[in-house]
Amino acid sequence: MEEFVGLREGSSGNPVTLQELWGPCPRIRRGIRGGLEWLKQKLFRLGEDWYFLMTLGVLMALVSCAMDLAVESVVRAHQWLYREIGDSHLLRYLSWTVYPVALVSFSSGFSQSITPSSGGSGIPEVKTMLAGVVLEDYLDIKNFGAKVVGLSCTLACGSTLFLGKVGPFVHLSVMMAAYLGRVRTTTIGEPENKSKQNEMLVAAAAVGVATVFAAPFSGVLFSIEVMSSHFSVWDYWRGFFAATCGAFMFRLLAVFNSEQETITSLYKTSFRVDVPFDLPEIFFFVALGGLCGILGSAYLFCQRIFFGFIRNNRFSSKLLATSKPVYSALATLVLASITYPPSAGRFLASRLSMKQHLDSLFDNHSWALMTQNSSPPWPEELDPQHLWWEWYHPRFTIFGTLAFFLVMKFWMLILATTIPMPAGYFMPIFVYGAAIGRLFGETLSFIFPEGIVAGGITNPIMPGGYALAGAAAFSGAVTHTISTALLAFEVTGQIVHALPVLMAVLAANAIAQSCQPSFYDGTVIVKKLPYLPRILGRNIGSHRVRVEHFMNHSITTLAKDMPLEEVVKVVTSTDVAKYPLVESTESQILVGIVRRAQLVQALKAEPPSWAPGHQQCLQDILAAGCPTEPVTLKLSPETSLHEAHNLFELLNLHSLFVTSRGRAVGCVSWVEMKKAISNLTNPPAPK
C-alpha cells in the first residue's frame, strides 16, 4: 500500500510522508537522521578494517574472560572435592588424580575426534601459514570450537599438568580473524584477497597474546619475533590497535566481574622504587641470564630428543596413533601422582595455581632470611596471605624445595608437551624461569644477608627482582625472543628492573640462539612442517655462495611452439604445480608461467579436432583462453644465497625461476635453499 504524501507548508514542493509531517518533532528527527548519516559517512572513510580489528579484539577478550571464569569454577569444584572428601589418603589421592585424568582424556579425545589439527600449541602451524604455506583445516571454524573446549579442560587440571593458554589463544585469534574475514567478503561481495587476509592474521596473532596477559605492547612484539623475520609497519599499527582493544576489554571485564577495583596489572608486586638494585648486582643479573640460557638450551635439546623418542618408540607411537586418550590419561596419571600434596607435591608447591606461583615467586622479601630463626607452619588449607609458606619445609628449607621444583618440573614439563591436546607451553617456562631466578636471588641474599655495599650505602637484595629477571630470561631463551622482558614489565606493572632484566634476557638469548633452535622452530622441525631455515650469523659465507651453485638445473619448460602431443606428454609425466613458459624451443626466453591445473583444464576442454596427431601447438591453447601469469620476480645465477634468502623471507616466496640473459636456466625452491644453508653450517666431508 502506497503511503500518502503531502507538501510541507512553505517548502519547495518536495513530497513528504504524512507520518513525517504529523509526527512529533519532525525537525529534530530530521536533524538526528542527518547527523547519523554524516557520522556514518565520516566513520567509513577510515575503512572497515579498523572496525574488523576492534571486533576481533573484543570477541577474543570475551572468549578469554569466559574461559577463565569456567576454568575457575571447575578448579574450585576440584578443590572443594579434595577438601571435603575426608581424611582417607586413598580417597584424597583418587580425588586428586582421577579429576585431571578424566578432564585430559576428554580434552584429548574430543579435540582429536573433531579435528586432529586442534591439538598442541598452534603457534608452529600459524607460523607456517604466515610463511605462505596452505594448511588444510587449521583455520576452520570447527577447529575453533574443538580448541576452546579442549583448552578449557586442559586449564581446569590446574597445577597437576602445569600448562597455559598463550599458544592456543594465538591460534584461536587467527582462526577468528579468518572467519570474520570470510564473513566480511561474503557480506560485501568483494573477492578474497590473500594479501589482506595475511595482514589480518598477523594482527590477530598479537591479539592472542594481549588477551591472555592484558599486555598489548609485548603481545605485538612477541608475535613479530615468533611469527616472522620481516614485518611491515602497516601491520605494526594494525597489531597495536587490535591488541589494545583486546587487552582493554579483557581487563575491563575483570572489573565488571568484581575481580579488580580498577584496571591494574595482572600480577601484583611491591619492589622498592628508590633503590631497586645496587650497581654491582648488574653482574649477577647477567650471570643469571647466562644460567637461564644454558638451562634453556638443555631444555630445548631434551624436549626435542624426548619427543622423537616418544614418536619412534613402538609402544608409545602405537598409543598415539590409535588411542590418544589412553596415552594422555597415562601421562596425566604420572604427573598427578607426583604432584599429590601429601607426597612429593608437598615440595613442589602443588596446591598453588600458576598465577599464585608467580605471585609468591615475585615476593620482594627474602624467604631464606625470614626462616633462619623461625619455621612457618604448613597450613592444612592454602593461606592466600602467605603463599610463600607453600615453598617451605623444615627439613628441605627454601633452597631444597626450589631446587627440587626445578629438577622435577624440568622433565615433567617435557612429558606434558607430548600429550596430544590443546595446551600452551609459554606460561610454564615463564614460571620455571621465575623459580630459577628466585633460587638465585635467595642464594645471594643468604650469602649477603645485609646486602651489597655500593657507594657507602647498603641495600638488602630483593629475590623477587631476580625471579622477574629469571622468568623473562628463561622464557626468552626457550622462545628466542627479547620481548619477554617487556612482557615481564607489563604483567607486573614494574619497570624499576628494566636494565638488569633486559641484560639478562640478552645474555640468555646469546647462548640459546647459538646452541638450539627455538621451541617453536624445533616443533616445526619435529612435526616436519614446511619451513625455510634462517641464516645464522654473518660469517658463514652466505654472500659468497651464488644461486648457480645450488639451483635446480633440470627444469621442464613449455614453449609456445611446442606441439600439443608434447605438451600432453610433459603434463602427464610431471607433477609440478607450474611450468615456465618460454617464447620458443630454440630461444628459451622466459615470458610467463602456466599453472598445471589450468593447463589440464584447457586441454580437456578442447574439441576432438585438437587431439594428438594434429600439428597444433601450445600457442593455440593459450589463445583459446588458458590463463598465464607474468614473471614479476626472477633470480640471476650471480645472485648470492644471502640475497635470495632475504627475498624469499620478505615476500613469503616458495620458488623462483632463474634466468640468464632472459633464458630460463633453472629454479630455486625451499628444497634447494635448505640444502645450501645446511652445507654452509655443516660442510660435507671431502670425498
Curated annotation (Swiss-Prot):
Ca(2+) binds at residues 259, 261, 278, 281. GO terms for cellular component: basolateral plasma membrane; chloride channel complex; plasma membrane. Coiled coil: none annotated. Residues 116-127, 203-224, 349-360, 464-496 dip into the membrane without crossing it. InterPro entries: CBS_dom, CBS_dom_sf, Cl-channel_core, Cl_channel-K, Cl_channel_volt-gated, ClC. Chloride binds at residues 121, 426. It comes from the Eukaryota. GO terms for molecular function: chloride channel activity; metal ion binding; voltage-gated chloride channel activity. Residues 1-50, 521-687 are cytoplasmic. Residues 551-609, 626-684 form the CBS domain. N-glycosylated. Gene3D superfamilies: CBS-domain (3.10.580.10), Clc chloride channel (1.10.3080.10). It is found in: Basolateral cell membrane. The chain crosses the membrane at residues 51-82, 91-111, 141-160, 161-180, 236-255, 282-310, 325-342, 400-420, 421-440, 500-520. SMART domains: CBS. Compared with CLCNKA/BSND, CLCNKB/BSND is more sensitive to pH and less responsive to Ca(2+). It is linked to Bartter syndrome 3: A form of Bartter syndrome, an autosomal recessive disorder characterized by impaired salt reabsorption in the thick ascending loop of Henle with pronounced salt wasting, hypokalemic metabolic alkalosis, and varying degrees of hypercalciuria. Belongs to the chloride channel (TC 2.A.49) family. CLCNKB subfamily. Homodimer. Interacts with BSND. This is Chloride channel protein ClC-Kb. It comes from Homo sapiens.
